Amino acid sequence: MNQDELKQAVAKAALDYIKPHLQSDTILGIGTGSTANYFIDALAEVRTQFEGAVASSEASAERLKKHNIPVYELNSVSGLEFYIDGADETNPRLELIKGGGAALTREKIVAANAKTFICIADESKWVDVLGDFPLPIEVIPMARSYVARELVKLGGDPVYREGCVTDNGNIILDVFNLRILEPVKLEQQINQITGVVTNGLFAMRPADVLLLGSQEGVKTIKVDA
């Protein structure tokens, strides 16, 4: 299978995973990116079996609406049963790097509201140590230079993502050359820098379930509590 076929396979596996739990009042959290798009397309098959979805980006909201899946504002719902999203990297503890699509802040907010965070990814995203993929950081525009200097002090090499404006009106710095041995600690450190909205480490709230597409099929991975 090529990468797109692996993404389709994990999207189908995620649908199979949640299908027995869907009820008429279930509201799902939906992520952003190519793998999440495959899941949205698969979700259309069962759109009459749940109430609707909260999207982590304008792009995902539009795709859901095209499938006639009702889209709700997060502030209008009390909680989410599942959050389904892809990742740019995952380690064996299901700590993630996300944000290649610049939706990291909204993804993190939606994930925080979900009882179960299901990460769907192909095997190319599996790493022992996070950091080969540059870590995205959403930054208030006027703080860009200051935040970049602080990130250099942490050992990173920040690069301004040209032409990228987030759904929140902010900019993205991609931080290269980080070997992230302590993801929770680094997530906290970066978030404490004045001007940072949030960073793409999902370590304080990691995934609960990883559906990993491989040539041998889709593997279901959970971290023992």
Swiss-Prot record:
Its EC number is 5.3.1.6. One of its GO terms (molecular function) is ribose-5-phosphate isomerase activity. GO terms for cellular component: cytosol. The keyword Isomerase applies. It is an enzyme of class 5 (isomerase). Pfam families: Rib_5-P_isom_A. GO terms for biological process: D-ribose metabolic process; pentose-phosphate shunt, non-oxidative branch. It comes from the Bacteria. The active site is at residue 107. Transmembrane segments: none annotated. It catalyses: aldehydo-D-ribose 5-phosphate = D-ribulose 5-phosphate. Pathway: Carbohydrate degradation; pentose phosphate pathway; D-ribose 5-phosphate from D-ribulose 5-phosphate (non-oxidative stage): step 1/1. SUPFAM superfamilies: D-ribose-5-phosphate isomerase (RpiA), lid domain, NagB/RpiA/CoA transferase-like. InterPro entries: NagB/RpiA_transferase-like, Ribose5P_isomerase_typA_subgr, Ribose5P_isomerase_type_A. Keywords: Isomerase. The keyword Zinc-finger does not apply. Substrate binds at residues 32-35, 85-88, 98-101, 125. Homodimer. NCBIfam families: PRK00702.1, rpiA. Catalyzes the reversible conversion of ribose-5-phosphate to ribulose 5-phosphate. Belongs to the ribose 5-phosphate isomerase family. HAMAP family: Rib_5P_isom_A. This is Ribose-5-phosphate isomerase A. The gene is rpiA.
